[in-house]
Amino acid sequence: MGDWSFLGNFLEEVHKHSTVVGKVWLTVLFIFRMLVLGTAAESSWGDEQADFRCDTIQPGCQNVCYDQAFPISHIRYWVLQIIFVSTPSLVYMGHAMHTVRMQEKRKLREAERAKEVRGSGSYEYPVAEKAELSCWEEGNGRIALQGTLLNTYVCSILIRTTMEVGFIVGQYFIYGIFLTTLHVCRRSPCPHPVNCYVSRPTEKNVFIVFMLAVAALSLLLSLAELYHLGWKKIRQRFVKPRQHMAKCQLSGPSVGIVQSCTPPPDFNQCLENGPGGKFFNPFSNNMASQQNTDNLVTEQVRGQEQTPGEGFIQVRYGQKPEVPNGVSPGHRLPHGYHSDKRRLSKASSKARSDDLSV
């Protein structure tokens, strides 16, 4: 039989871009089909036509009877089965390699464009790092199947499953399950029914049952892979939105406690929210100067009424001053002010009644 290395190299590339179940299917294909078929089964069906004997000397009768008993050899039938079953995987492998290559080119173009934007002194990827840009693996080391790549993979599984079923049914209708030792031929040019004998029927039956069992196992693996991919997509479509909604409910807008702004002890004016969300001072400089002037005049009048003989206002810390009408208690002088013994006027060194010492 021919060399399987060419097909094996292609299937090794498919192994890199397959799911876990797909890798098991490829292992079964390599070991239990190609290896067994190329080593043991071929020796059992060596020169099958030469070992086929018939009880006749009629020219051409033996060839006609062999064609009736074996329309196609089991070995060649199984080779066709492996080729047709592997073809969808090869098509998927070609699409995967094309997709990865396009992704690599796109990332390289983005890297070159970013280098042009940054300038000539930027870092350039070496060849080894450029090859790593085509990595499509997830965190657990598996290939991320999504988009058109996932659709192609599912189609390849469906086609190979159909091929598998077709070849199993075809083998049953052509040969049945077991080979019989005696085959009765009634075809022309045989003058009468001729008895023909198959060589090594028991050994061939063992290989036939084994290959049918491997084909059934491959079919079950294909169905399991379809179920795995379908269940994964259904879980991603229905479970993840529910988890997202639950997270949104848990992390909803929290109602905070609005706390008022408390000014420092010597700070008599609080900032208020102005239009546009900005802070502004509700009192202008002119208003503050006018209020301070009014407070000073009021304190001067009170000092003259309490101590008519003195020209200074004495502020005692232990005594709480009365607040005149119309003056806000929040704008009175703080308790940190004290009397000053310095001269109050540059024009005269004598203290006058209108001088104010704070």
Swiss-Prot record:
Keywords: Atrial fibrillation, Cardiomyopathy, Cell junction, Cell membrane, Disease variant, Gap junction, Membrane, Phosphoprotein, Transmembrane, Transmembrane helix
Listed GO CC annotations: cell projection; connexin complex; gap junction; intercalated disc; plasma membrane
Biased composition (Basic residues): 332-345
Keyword Zinc: no
Source organism, top-level taxon: Eukaryota
Subcellular location: Cell membrane; Cell junction, Gap junction
Modified residues (Phosphoserine): 353, 357
Membrane topology recorded in Swiss-Prot or TrEMBL: Multi-pass membrane protein
Pfam family, one: Connexin
Extracellular topology ranges: 41-76, 186-205
Span list, region Disordered: 319-358
Listed GO MF terms: connexin binding; disordered domain specific binding; gap junction channel activity involved in atrial cardiac muscle cell-AV node cell electrical coupling; gap junction channel activity involved in AV node cell-bundle of His cell electrical coupling; gap junction channel activity involved in bundle of His cell-Purkinje myocyte electrical coupling; gap junction channel activity involved in cardiac conduction electrical coupling; gap junction channel activity involved in Purkinje myocyte-ventricular cardiac muscle cell electrical coupling; gap junction channel activity involved in SA node cell-atrial cardiac muscle cell electrical coupling
SUPFAM superfamilies named in the record: Connexin43
Job description of the protein: One gap junction consists of a cluster of closely packed pairs of transmembrane channels, the connexons, through which materials of low MW diffuse from one cell to a neighboring cell.
Disease tied to this entry: Atrial standstill 1: A rare arrhythmia characterized by the absence of electrical and mechanical activity in the atria. Electrocardiographically, it is characterized by bradycardia, the absence of P waves, and a junctional narrow complex escape rhythm. Atrial fibrillation, familial, 11: A familial form of atrial fibrillation, a common sustained cardiac rhythm disturbance. Atrial fibrillation is characterized by disorganized atrial electrical activity and ineffective atrial contraction promoting blood stasis in the atria and reduces ventricular filling. It can result in palpitations, syncope, thromboembolic stroke, and congestive heart failure.
Subunit and interaction comment: A connexon is composed of a hexamer of connexins.
UniProt similarity note: Belongs to the connexin family. Alpha-type (group II) subfamily.
Protein name (record): Gap junction alpha-5 protein
